[in-house]
């Protein structure tokens, strides 16, 4: 992953993601991650998912060097808080692994055991996201980059928009 900074654009908060420095193995470099993030998010959107808003742009640094970046709009700016599935999974007493454990059976058990969101809807979303990630070649979906949005004031919970798609399309 490259560097990230926060900016305000047209009155909204965005996280700018910069490409990482190229690795020694240029063929397996993540320098296209910004393009992948943008394109994959738009494909997820075309598939019917709620997804983070993304923009492609150029960032000119203090030395005048231009870099391709992706801007990801903050979907928590309305006071909602992101609860990563890893945190939700940690609240499940019977979970055999920590929140980041990747065993499918443990993930499905946590989906069934959690009480914040209807389990059948969360399970359906998980499988839909799983299939879309597979179609897009996302090798980096884990329990820390999907989850729920919690609005404590309104006492409501919803599935967070799909985000962190920079490892797709490789």
Locations of regions flagged by a protein language model:
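Conserved ATP-binding subdomain of kinase catalytic cores across diverse folds
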Residues: 1-95
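ATP-dependent phospho-/nucleotidyl transfer catalytic cores
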Residues: 71-130
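Conserved kinase catalytic-core segment
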Residues: 105-169
